[in-house]
Amino acid sequence: MAGRPARMHEMEVLAPRRDIEPDLRLTLLSGFELSFRSRQVPLAPSGQRLIAYLALQDRWVPRSLCAGTLWPDSPEAHAAANLRSVLWRLNVSQQPLVETSRSDLRLASTVHVDVHEMTRRAEHLLRPGGPHATAVREGV
């Protein structure tokens, strides 16, 4: 369709520069905290659950799976309505937290997640031939 804006998952997303502090930061390891430019962003518990779930998935997730996971005891239509409501409430912030397509969701690529950083560091340390890989594997 001509003139249609490209969706985020249809474009190549560049990794954030490491020398610049990210505007949006999500901390999960020591409890849920979302901050924008070092100021805490309050979210309702349902918004926190969605953001944490998407952060841990670290990929595009079908809307139906999100709804079913976050509201497992609700009928499918009610769970889908709950998800739409949470997305609408999250959408009122100036910084987009969730990227959406017609059928899928993911955490916005602009959100720095502590779990992702920890995973990258662990993978770096355990990389075959890396300086710490042998010591870590041998328990030294």
Model-flagged regions — what are they?
Residues 104, 121-140:
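Short acidic-capped amphipathic helix/loop micro-motif used as an active-site/signal-coupling element
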Residues 1-46, 96-106, 111:
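Short boundary/linker motifs that mark transitions into or out of structured domains
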Residues 71-81:
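Short, positively charged loop/turn segments that connect secondary-structure elements
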Residues 84-87, 91-95:
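C-terminal flanking helix
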Residues 39-70, 90:
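Short amphipathic alpha-helical recognition elements used for nucleic-acid or partner binding
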